[in-house]
């Protein structure tokens, strides 16, 4: 995970993906409390937990900077045209397996940014010796846009499970030993 952390920030065709900073936290929390975000996640953010979320994010940022704790989670923001337009999370779940989550705020949806984010992190994982074997996405069955994006980025459906609120599909991208 530390090798992935060191590879960020990175640029896609039109966006910059960089680590979440302290000055982004208020925007980040406000954004994840909006209806568009909660529509397609299997848990529901709740404003009463904002202080807990803020403290967790601050602790995460300090851990990245100090590099004193094993990293299991990376949160980034996506800048498009100099404005914050979304986010990408990377969670280490096993030996070389990483769960991804990405989102784009409504004002920037429909511009191909989600596909850029997913292709960008996939290219990064393939192109460097980062110890990544598989990237995985969990997508609610009704999130047709994200399903299309996953398929366009080369992810394959490998299974499904019943989540808290809906059926979730699991898509995976496997990186071979040559980084493809």
Language-model features: locations:
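Generic, well-ordered alpha-helical segments
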Residues: 29, 49-53, 70
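Acyl-donor (CoA/ACP) binding surface of acyl/acetyltransferases
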Residues: 1-39, 75-180
């Amino acid at each position: 995970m530390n090798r992935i952390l060191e590879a960020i920030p990175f640029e896609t065709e039109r966006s910059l993906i960089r680590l979440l900073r302290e000055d982004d936290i208020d925007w980040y929390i406000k954004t994840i409390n909006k209806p568009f975000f909660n529509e397609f996640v299997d848990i529901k953010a709740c404003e009463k937990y904002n202080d807990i979320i803020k403290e967790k994010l601050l602790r995460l940022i300090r851990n990245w900077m100090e590099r004193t704790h094993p990293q299991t989670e990376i949160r980034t923001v996506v800048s498009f045209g100099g404005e914050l337009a979304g986010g990408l999370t990377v969670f280490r779940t096993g030996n070389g397996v990483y769960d991804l989550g990405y989102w784009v705020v409504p004002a920037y949806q429909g511009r191909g940014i989600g596909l850029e984010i997913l292709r960008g992190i996939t290219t990064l994982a393939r192109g460097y010796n980062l110890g990544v074997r598989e990237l995985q996405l969990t997508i609610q069955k009704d999130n047709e846009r994200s399903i299309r994006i996953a398929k366009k980025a080369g992810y394959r459906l490998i299974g499904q499970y019943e989540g808290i609120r809906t059926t979730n599909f699991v898509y995976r991208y496997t990186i071979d030993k040559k980084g493809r």
